A protein has these predicted regions:
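Residue-level signal for inorganic ion chemistry
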Residues: 2, 52, 105-108
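Nucleotide phosphate-binding/pyrophosphate-handling subdomain across enzymes
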Residues: 3-51
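Short glycine-rich anion-binding loops that position phosphate/pyrophosphate groups of nucleotides
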Residues: 5, 33-35, 58-59, 109-111
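Alpha-helical elements of the RecA-like P-loop NTPase motor core of helicases
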Residues: 11, 39, 91, 113-114
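Active-site catalytic pocket residues across diverse enzymes, especially alpha/beta-hydrolases
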Residues: 17, 21, 73, 97, ...
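Generic beta-sheet signal
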Residues: 26-28, 101-107
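C-terminal helical cap/extension that packs against the catalytic core
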Residues: 42-102
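Glycine/aspartate-rich loop-and-adjacent alpha/beta segment that forms the canonical ThDP
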Residues: 108-127
Length: 127
């Protein structure tokens, strides 16, 4: 999980993805604030994903809606879905993934802790 919210950070994250996850199926969970460079982030990051799930960052009045983000991402990627909640995004990512897949959540730092909590709860349920 990385905090990536601008063009330069997106380029660095793209390099990291290319270096560490070559030949892996990559699924993104992406949520951003509307005052960030989300179009550029989508353009830079989209080529490395197999699927992209967009989310609305909860509890932040500056959050870009998952639907608006999905419409933007769709300019650069043909497998994008807007999730109704973080829980749905995590569930969808698990359904799309296989054992060797990489699920990468990035964008607004404010929702990443919540994603981790959801994953922990899912692991507990599945154990």
């Amino acid at each position: 999980y990385k905090r990536q919210h601008n063009e330069d950070a997106a380029r660095k994250l793209a390099q990291t993805v290319q270096f560490y996850f070559t030949n892996k199926k990559i699924i993104y969970i992406m949520g951003v604030l509307r005052d960030k460079e989300y179009e550029k982030i989508a353009e830079i990051m989209s080529p490395f994903a197999d699927s992209i799930i967009t989310v609305t960052t909860p509890g932040n009045p500056r959050a870009l809606s998952a639907l608006t983000l999905a419409e933007t991402v769709a300019k650069y990627h043909n497998r994008v879905t807007a999730a109704d909640s973080l829980e749905e995004a995590v569930e969808m990512s698990y359904l799309l993934a296989d054992k060797d897949s990489v699920i990468l959540a990035f964008g607004s730092l404010s929702y990443l802790g919540q994603i981790m909590d959801i994953i922990d709860k899912m692991k507990t349920k599945r154990a």
